[in-house]
Amino acid sequence: MTRPIALVTCLFGWLLVAATASAEVLPVVKPEEAGFSADRLARLARTLKSEIEQKRMPGAVVLVARRGRIGYFETFGKLDPAGNAPMPKDAIFRVYSMTKPWTSVATMMLVEEGRIVLTDPVAKFLPQLAKLQVAVEKTDPATGKTVTELVPAQRDITIQDLLRHTSGFTYGMRVKNAAVREAYVQHRVDAVDMTNAELIDRIAKAPLVHQPRTAFEYGRSTDVLGRVVEVVSGMTLGRFFEQRIFWPLKMVDSGFHVPPDKPARLAQAFPKDVVSGRDVRMLAVTAPPTYEAGGQGGVSTAMDYARFAQMLLGRGVLDGTRLLGRHTVDFMTTDHLGKMRDTFPAAGYGFGLGFAVRVDPGVATSAGSVGDYNWAGAGGTYFWVDPKEQLVVGLMAQTPGEIRAYYRPLIRDLVYQALLD
């Protein structure tokens, strides 16, 4: 097949899928039919409207589905605080780290095909990541000052380590280890003007923050995993998402950028952080990026992400389309930290293969069920799945900064208090 014909065929296939998918939504019913009290759900609306009136949140979309049916799907505030357009249900949001579950699912699809094993050393696919060093901080007894010693990694980083963030990779802007932080700055590991392949070359030059498989450390593990998906599949990460996840699930507004016909639907944040007063800088998403970051670069809508979450709740299947086997989803959504759980920052939760997983009925700071799982994005988005309650919830907002952490337990409590059965 010649290249022009291939391009036309690919374009036709995309248009066909998009046309078919445009009408695909989860069934919408009255709150009571989904097991919710409409009166109690009104508390959620009052609360978010109050947040908007206080100018703490520019706008939001909330979608709550139970037993495969939407019982609550409402919008609040403005699409862009600089304008007057109300928030639409099909608003597009920068989901930041809610890209990570897509990358985790992509990885497990390759595991199911026998192309990856969780015990595989990452260096099998990315040779630059062999023989890494670890930056160990110690106190100099003579001076009392903190000094850093570089020591060899005692074990290989595995695919499982990337999925559960026990690799030793971190985020340079948040790590306390000074030597690691300086190395990330020197080699521009946290930059966005690179490719997925260039990330590996850069991060290979920086030391790990701890020995692999000794602690949870949230960071670039999923970005590295995105490059593994590319190498194993022979596709860019964005193309893999499109062909293997978005098209089958009819997620028509998800990807690594907002196409030319959709920027008017892109939600925006306040220009200043509502807590710190600092300028807010959001990811540029109106043009195709060179860096399709598996851990942070995605955009999506409430409905698109709900379809993805509903697939997970369905243990790998949605509308008859199966992406993963049921045992694989169960395996992903159970705790994989074990004795390392005390290094995970969320009380009452462990971490699976891409998700925080509730392991205790108490301890946590918000309502939920043992076995529920979730993740969030730095821009203010949040979702969770509760298999016990057959519940999928998405909060889509652009509220970066400290305040985003306030809305996560708030929305959980407001949803759970409205359950009738």
Predicted feature descriptions by range:
Residues A42-K49, V62, G68, F93-F125, ...:
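Active-site SXXK
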Residues N374-D421:
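Structured C-terminal helix/loop/strand segments within mature extracytoplasmic catalytic/sensor domains
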Residues M1-P4:
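Positively charged n-region of N-terminal signal peptides that target proteins for export
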Residues P27, P127-V370:
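Short, surface-exposed loop or secondary-structure junction motifs
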Residues V8-A18:
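Bacterial N-terminal signal peptides
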Residues A21-A23:
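Boundary at the C-terminal end of the N-terminal hydrophobic targeting segment
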Residues V25-V95, R115-V117, K131-T139, P409, ...:
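Short, conserved catalytic-motif segment at the N-terminal edge
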